[in-house]
Amino acid sequence: RARQPSLSPDGRDLIVVRNKLQENWLAKLSIDQTMEPVAEFDRNAQIATPVHSPDGRHLAVSMWRDGVRDIWILNQDGTVYRRVTADGAHDMDPAWSSDGRWLYFSSDRTGIFNIYGVELETERLYQVTNVLGGAFHPAPSPNGQTLVFESFSHNGMDIVSTSNGRDQWSERGVLAQPLE
């Protein structure tokens, strides 16, 4: 079985998460339906929501390990490029800005899931949303001016579109540890 596909920027293949028994791995699914493993992970790690960087060189993933879920950036061959978050928060749903300078994700670091953004060059972390019901699955527009995400409300899950004005974000300082 394959799940959570991410189309490569050139449109030639997908990166998918594969599961077998208690292990999961990343695989490349080509247009001709051939599938080749990219990276296998031990039983202590669970990979989710891979997404290609705009230049196609990297994948951002959410990885569950040692009781927490963090954001990692992998090379296309599945080797670790950088660990983005490393703290007690559960971080998931990575999404790149179209220029590759920002990585957005949802996190429960305040007790409620909201959208955060990290400027990869400076390692500065910002809280982008502040909603009571939780915010998930960020999707920045190609021009960076709009952010769409899922949010819980009294009606269930809603799709919310908001201005992506960085002047409205709350700066949360630098990441807990330097990016690897």
Where are each of the predicted segments found?
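Interface/linker segment at the passenger-translocator junction
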Residues: 172-180
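Conserved beta-propeller blade repeats
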Residues: 1-17, 42-62, 82, 86-106, ...
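A short local loop/turn or secondary-structure capping micro-motif enriched for an aromatic residue
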Residues: 3-5, 23-25, 45-46, 68-69, ...
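Beta-propeller blade-edge and WD-like acidic-aromatic loop motif
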Residues: 13, 17-39, 58, 62-83, ...
